[in-house]
Amino acid sequence: FVLGPHVNVYSRPALAEHARLGAVRWVAPLELPLDAIARINPPEQPVCTSHNVPLVTEVFGFGRLPLAFSARCFTARHFHLPKDECGFRCLEQPDGLLLSTTEGEPFLALNGIQTQSAAQHCLIGEAQALRAAGVRRVRLSPCSLRF
């Protein structure tokens, strides 16, 4: 299985335990810096899966950062519709509903049940640093513009 970025893995022993249970790939938590990722699953001595294969490290590399999930659909709520009778109004808002600060600065985007960053995260120029940290996969999240 793939260990997603919302599973709180912040240490090598925790990652090794998930690998023992069958994880083959780890998507690092969004807030972890590359040096921490490299310490948890170093490229020169990676955690191995239950089949003695190096566990693959992946990071979120492009798009709005998924910050939180809710049982409520914010898009349906915005349009005063019940969640189960929304008619997929989210399709009309491909990048979600932008929330701004009181100063008018973009803050968050509400996209269905997800709260996302308003700004797009982009690691395109960081290929060398990613490789040095042992990252072998980059997760991309599409958006309607500039992708």
Residue spans of the language-model regions?
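Active-site pocket-lining/capping segments in soluble small-molecule metabolic enzymes
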Residues: 1-13, 17, 21, 27-147
